[in-house]
Regions:
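Solvent-exposed loop/turn segments at secondary-structure junctions
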Residues: 10, 30-31, 40-43, 97-99, ...
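Histidine-rich, glycine-flanked metal-binding segment
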Residues: 1-32
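His/Asp/Glu-enriched, well-ordered alpha-helical/loop segment
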Residues: 47-48, 54-67, 206, 245-288
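Metal-associated gating/positioning segment near the N- to mid-region
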Residues: 26-95, 99-100
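Polyanionic/metal-chelating signatures
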Residues: 79, 84-233
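Active-site environment of divalent metal-dependent phosphoester hydrolases
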Residues: 42-45, 75, 98-102, 214-218, ...
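Generic beta-strand/beta-sheet core signal
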Residues: 5, 94, 210-212, 234-237, ...
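Divalent metal-coordination and catalytic microenvironments
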Residues: 2, 7, 28, 39, ...
Length: 288
């Protein structure tokens, strides 16, 4: 038996029941823990899909770490109820993949609340959405802006991280001064873009990287090593099986579809065994 009180499991086993307890016979069925959706756009692309309510991509600049997905979440999105019926009790809301650096993601509990603050999962760290490949170069190349190529993508990431390191060094230099010295000069001005990137460099914000092709994942790891941050997971990762050992060696997870691919060029080279290959890489040290 499983005892639930106030929507939470409070006991499992042989449980004496109160006479007023509601009993549901689920013999022959599966009971699982709540499902965590690790890549969601619920709330920022709510149903019905209207342009006036589509707030997941700030596609005005390829680098927008200053925007936060939680500031777009519509807490009345009917998709939340449908997801709950499917067993999803927690979900990670990310900005879309139009930008090289798309903004902060947030982890929410699937509970009713008028405010997004009331839905936040306690203690969950912020994340940062990055995207490589077709989407950024298509969105901005189509506007005759940089990036329009994959090498333009990489240049954009590197410029952003160089600026972040400069800002981080200024903050460290100021904090290293004595109290007397601090009184004689101003602290570095707040910069919303660079604050988020420095949060990544300081290990407080976790990178979630939209990426399909194997060689591009390897390039993103090269950039991470150059600037001293860690990629937590590659999302979609259609070709992760090609670099499974590299991902395992670097402690990087892959968040993948089990059976969906082929909907655009970079999503063609998939194998059914993708998730299994990544999970079992290097003697079972992979993460999928």
């Amino acid at each position: 038996s499983i005892l639930m009180e106030n929507n939470k499991i409070t006991a499992i086993g042989e449980i004496p029941l109160d006479t007023d307890a509601k009993v549901i016979d689920v013999k022959g069925k599966w009971i699982t823990p709540g499902i965590i959706d690790i890549h969601s756009h619920m709330g920022v692309y709510p149903a019905p899909g209207l342009r006036s309510n589509s707030d997941g991509n700030e596609a005005t600049n390829p680098v927008t770490p200053h925007v936060w997905a939680e500031h777009s979440v519509w807490t009345h999105d009917p998709q939340f109820t449908l997801a709950l019926k499917g067993g999803i009790t927690t979900f990670h809301v990310l900005p879309g993949s139009a930008n090289l650096i798309g903004g902060r993601g947030v982890t929410l509990k699937n509970v009713r609340s008028v405010t997004v603050q009331g839905m936040k999962f306690p203690g969950a760290p912020y994340t940062l959405k990055m995207a490589c490949g077709e989407n950024p170069k298509r969105v901005y190349g189509g506007k005759n802006k940089e990036p329009s190529t994959r090498m333009g993508n990489v240049a954009g990431y590197r410029k952003a991280w160089i600026n972040a390191q400069d800002y981080q060094n200024k903050l460290k230099e100021y904090e290293s001064k004595s109290d007397e010295a601090k009184e004689l000069e101003y602290a570095p001005s707040r910069d919303l873009e660079l604050e988020t990137l420095v949060g990544v460099l300081d290990g407080e914000i976790l990178i979630q990287n939209h990426c399909y092709r194997g060689e591009e994942m390897a390039v993103m790891l090269d950039i991470a090593k150059e600037f001293g941050y860690k990629v937590t997971a590659f999302h979609h990762a259609i070709e992760a099986y090609k670099v499974a050992d590299i991902l395992a060696d670097n402690g990087v997870c892959a968040a993948m579809w089990a059976d969906w691919w082929g909907f655009k060029h970079e999503a063609f080279d998939m194998v059914w065994e993708n998730a299994a290959i990544v999970d079992q890489a290097n003697g079972g040290k992979g993460c999928a």
